[in-house]
């Protein structure tokens, strides 16, 4: 639900930056939230548990799932070079440009709080001491892991190359009478909200 709030804020900010940020976050949300759901499913399938209190230490048994969770977690928090950063960056700038720096600050605080619950899940499920009756846990089958890998690739690709999503979005902005952003494969190239995702590293 919290991620939907970013989209609403982006639309409320208005302008090309706001609408582009909101639509980009919608796309990114599909990648990282669906990946998180699949990770939960993989953990439940492998452990036959549905409570965090009954887990612990399964990262040693499920390293692929742990890696997928790291990508999804960084993306939902908005850490570069994942996709969540690219859309949240635009939303922060859209709010500032709309004269709402306080809302931009609150949005940033929201990302910090998101980090808290991601860290809680990470520690409760994957880190710590493994439960003694989880010794036979192993990775989920390929039918679960392959979609996880595809979604994780989307989280990274739209983070490193946000133009993959922004270029089509830019076309939509023009259809609604908004001035398109100066967008390239690596991000917004000039003006408010400009950043070069590939140049950051």
Predicted regions and their residues:
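Interfacial segments of multi-pass membrane proteins
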Residues: 8-17, 87-105
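Membrane-interfacial loop-to-helix junctions in multi-pass transporters
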Residues: 16, 58-68, 98-102, 142-144
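Predominantly late transmembrane helices and immediately cytosolic-facing juxtamembrane segments
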Residues: 33-37, 98-139
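Alpha-helical multi-pass transmembrane bundles of energy-transducing inner-membrane proteins
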Residues: 2-52
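Glycine- and aromatic-enriched alpha-helical transmembrane segments of multi-pass membrane proteins
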Residues: 145-166, 190-201
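Alpha-helical transmembrane segments and their membrane-interface junctions
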Residues: 73-90, 152-174
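Membrane-interfacial helical/loop segments at transmembrane boundaries in membrane proteins
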Residues: 94, 164-195
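Hydrophobic alpha-helical transmembrane segments
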Residues: 104-111, 185-201
């Amino acid at each position: 639900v919290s991620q939907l709030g970013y989209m609403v804020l982006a639309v409320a900010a208005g302008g090309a930056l706001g609408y582009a940020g909101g639509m980009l976050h919608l796309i990114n949300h599909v990648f990282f939230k669906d990946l998180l759901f699949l990770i939960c499913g993989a953990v439940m399938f492998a452990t036959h548990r549905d409570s965090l209190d009954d887990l612990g230490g399964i990262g040693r048994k499920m390293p692929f799932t742990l890696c997928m969770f790291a990508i999804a977690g960084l993306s939902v928090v908005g850490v570069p070079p994942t996709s969540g950063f690219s859309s949240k960056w635009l939303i922060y700038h859209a709010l500032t440009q709309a004269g709402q720096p306080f809302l931009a600050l609150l949005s940033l605080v929201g990302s910090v709080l998101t980090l808290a619950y991601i860290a809680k899940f990470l520690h409760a499920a994957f880190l710590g001491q493994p439960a003694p009756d989880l010794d036979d846990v192993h990775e989920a089958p390929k039918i679960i892991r392959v979609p996880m890998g595809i979604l994780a690739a989307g989280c990274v690709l739209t983070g490193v190359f946000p133009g993959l999503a922004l270029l089509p979005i830019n076309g939509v902005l023009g259809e609604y009478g908004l001035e398109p952003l100066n967008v390239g494969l690596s991000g917004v190239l000039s003006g408010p909200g400009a950043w070069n995702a590939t140049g950051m590293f």
